Every structure is written in structure tokens, then in C-alpha cells.
Amino acid sequence: MKLEKTERHGTVREGYQILLRADAELLLPEDKPLMRAFYERMGETCMTWAQAIHGETLRKEFLSLDGIREKSQFGTQRYDFRMRCVWEEDAFAAILCESELLGQWREPQKSYHRISHVWNTEEELVLPFPQILDRFGVRLPKNRLPFRPDGIYPDGDQMVFFRNVTEHTPFLEKKLPRNVNKNNPK
């Protein structure tokens, strides 16, 4: 699958002060119009959220500060959205999207989220979890994972299972071996 790099940049300001820098880097498939449109829309939605919604929250926080000194010490936050193809084999490809919001110098990272899709590139369809597990030879006995995954994708001879950050849990990731030959499980 041939990929084309697309970048988007945005800034949220209040007067002279830069409150947020938002960047998106997308490696979009050139020859797959449905996949391309899907990820273009996702990138646009994430950039809109960063600039309009989170930017407005930062603007209110900045304007509520008293005095020039506190406003001058208000650090710039950074939002990064990256989309790339992490794995490709035959008629299948795994696309990984990572969204990271970096706080000010006092709070190094505010949030990190990951979304993955495994596509049948010939039909341009996203595979559901059970079909991904079956197709890539992963057998999950009960309680093998210490968490319920938000996403899965193949990475070489392993399957990566992950769960995004919530209020009470950190980002979790576990890699399990992938059975290439389904008749001979490892």
C-alpha cells in the first residue's frame, strides 16, 4: 500500500500568548479512497477538538489568571496526532492513530490515547475484534489479559493489546505471540 504524508498545524492564541500548538501527521493511503477519507476525517475531527474545544478551555483558564506575571508564566501546551500503518501483510493492514496532549512544564503529559484498526485493504473494510483474533491465530484463554482491551493490532509475530488511560487506570499494553500456523498452536 502506497502512503502519502499529510501534515496539519494549528495554534491557539490569546493576544501575544501562544496557549496551544496542535500538529497532525497522517500517512494516508494513496490508492484506497475510503480508507483515505476515513482518516482525513478523523484527523480533521481531532484537530478541531484540539483547537476549538480544548483551546477554548485553555483560553478561559488563561483569562482567569490575575496579573501579568502569572499570565507570562502560563506555558504552551502541545497536541500531537499521528496516524501510520504499523503492519501490512497480503490484503491486510493495521493502522495506528496516536493522540497525545502534552501539558505545561509542571505537568509533562496530560493524556495519551491510541486507536487501531485492522483493514481488509482489498474490500476497504475494518475487521471486528473476533475476526482479527481468528484471522491472525490468537487464542485467548479466559483471564489471559489483566484488562479488557480498547484495541488490538498485529505487530510482526505478536499481537498488541492495549487499553487507554481513564481516570483510575494508566495506559496498559500487552504483547502476546501470534500463531502463524493455526493448526499448530504454540
PLM segments and residue spans:
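Compositionally biased intrinsically disordered regions enriched in Thr/Gly
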Residues: M1-K186
